[in-house]
């Protein structure tokens, strides 16, 4: 037996090789999938009869623009397979060193750093956004839709909690961000990129500046601290952190020739989900107990599946995801916990309550328990209401179409006593999760209600 000192060159499997494997049928395959002519799925739907397919991860590491702090980076997604299943970003940030350190101060990146670093992700078709996921959406979605068994691991993947440094050193970071695109939850609505021969598909990442991500707080060894001091900037560093690696893995599916032929014969209809961030509105605090405030939810046409909303504390707007009354401070080394900003919440369609005024806890505990994947351990001021029976599935069952009854949607809130008496500043934020129908016709992707314009 001889040894070969040379490192073997391992090539990636090709599309044609993978399709050849998928087309092969053995005895067990016939029992699992049945004959091709009996498969009526448009691709593959979880826990339902499905066509044969094989998954193929592809590394995306080239693009246009800047994949550094404050930059915008666009990566092409070529048709390396028949369907796009998922996207995951891998990010490395180098260590940094401050010019000086003062006793009684601590520095840290914000929690879930990957959500904060990437201000938005836009999946585009012919330069028009098909889906845009904001930093706010990723934070909120993870709070309710990452199940309890995976929540801790997911939080660590995307950057962990506050990790304070009491020195001039800021540690390096390795981040993994599974991008929560709707089709990553159900391959039955995977993006049929192989059929979109007339479209150009890209993914665009917008990065926040370093000065938006690193915070300094006053945390004395004993006694109460004053909390927020300032954000760290490049000028505070002898060696500023840098993004040293940014890569994306795209998971594709390769299906059989029969599946491709069948879906090429007629228009191909697919359900999609799209979150829309509603413009934030500063809250004018009422002085009387029981007073309510109403906020319109302006969203584009589509089936309304769920609402996510909250009252963000913007006294120090540098805190990107703080939704409580009472700014965070340290007392004898323990970080303070704020209190809820709301007492009751209702949802109106037109001039009638679709959801009556209910205790705020209904929207942070009961609703997630019934319809989502995770119930927050305490009321952190982020709320949800799902019109659909099961928010995790892409099935829109229970969703409403406000245009059918020509009504607007609004969220009505009753501020808590703590908010009414607080000198702090707040804003109302909301995200509408809506469903649409896409279709493929003659090699082009279009949205059925909007003539191909994905905005």
UniProtKB/Swiss-Prot annotation:
GO MF assignments: structural molecule activity
SUPFAM superfamilies reported in the protein's UniProt record: Group II dsDNA viruses VP (SSF49749)
Domain of life of the organism encoding this protein: Viruses
Compartments where found: Virion
Main subcellular location: virion
Entry keyword Kinase: no
InterPro entries named among the record's database cross-references: Capsid_N, MCP_C, MCP_C_sf, VP_dsDNA_II
Name of the featured protein: Major capsid protein
Organism: Heliothis virescens ascovirus 3e (HvAV-3e)
Gene: MCP
């Amino acid at each position: 037996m001889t040894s070969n000192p040379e490192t073997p060159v391992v090539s990636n499997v090709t599309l044609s090789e993978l399709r050849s494997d998928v087309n092969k049928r053995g005895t067990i395959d016939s029992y699992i999938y049945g004959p091709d002519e009996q498969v009526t799925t448009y691709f593959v739907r979880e826990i339902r009869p499905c066509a044969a397919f094989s998954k193929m991860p592809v590394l995306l590491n080239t693009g246009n623009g800047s994949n550094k702090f404050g930059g915008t980076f666009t990566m092409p997604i070529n048709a390396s397979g028949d369907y796009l299943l998922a996207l995951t970003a891998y990010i490395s940030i180098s260590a940094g060193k401050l010019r000086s350190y003062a006793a009684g101060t601590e520095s840290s990146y914000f929690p879930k750093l990957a959500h904060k670093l990437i201000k938005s992700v836009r999946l585009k078709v012919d330069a028009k956004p098909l889906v845009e996921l904001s930093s706010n959406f990723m934070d909120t979605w993870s709070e309710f839709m990452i199940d309890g068994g995976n929540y801790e691991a997911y939080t660590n993947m995307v950057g962990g909690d506050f990790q304070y440094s009491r020195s001039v050193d800021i540690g390096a970071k390795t981040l993994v961000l599974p991008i929560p695109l709707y089709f990553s939850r159900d391959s039955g609505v995977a993006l049929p990129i192989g059929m979109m021969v007339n479209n150009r598909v890209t993914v665009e990442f917008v990065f926040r500046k370093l000065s938006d991500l690193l915070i300094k707080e006053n945390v004395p060894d004993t006694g109460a601290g004053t909390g927020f001091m300032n954000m760290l900037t490049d000028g505070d560093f002898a060696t500023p952190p840098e993004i040293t690696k940014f890569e994306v893995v795209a998971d594709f599916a390769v299906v059989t020739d029969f599946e491709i032929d069948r879906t090429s014969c007629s228009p191909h209809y697919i359900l999609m989900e799209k979150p829309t961030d509603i413009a934030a509105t500063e809250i004018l605090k009422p002085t009387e107990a029981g007073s309510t405030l109403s906020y319109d939810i302006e969203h584009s046409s589509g089936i309304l599946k769920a609402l996510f909303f909250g009252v963000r504390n913007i006294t120090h707007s540098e805190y990107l995801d703080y939704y409580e009354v009472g700014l965070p401070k340290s007392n004898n080394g323990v970080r303070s916990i704020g209190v809820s900003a709301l007492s009751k919440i209702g949802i109106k369609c037109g001039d009638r309550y679709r959801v009556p005024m209910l205790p705020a806890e209904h929207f942070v505990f009961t609703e997630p328990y019934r319809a989502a994947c995770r119930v927050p351990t305490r009321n952190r001021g982020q709320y949800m209401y799902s019109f659909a029976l099961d928010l995790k599935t892409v099935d829109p069952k229970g969703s409403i179409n406000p245009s059918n009854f020509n009504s607007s949607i609004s969220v009505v809130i009753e501020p808590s006593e703590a908010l009414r008496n607080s000198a702090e500043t707040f804003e109302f934020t909301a995200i509408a999760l809506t469903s649409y129908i896409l279709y493929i016709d003659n090699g082009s992707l279009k949205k059925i209600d909007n003539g191909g314009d994905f905005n």
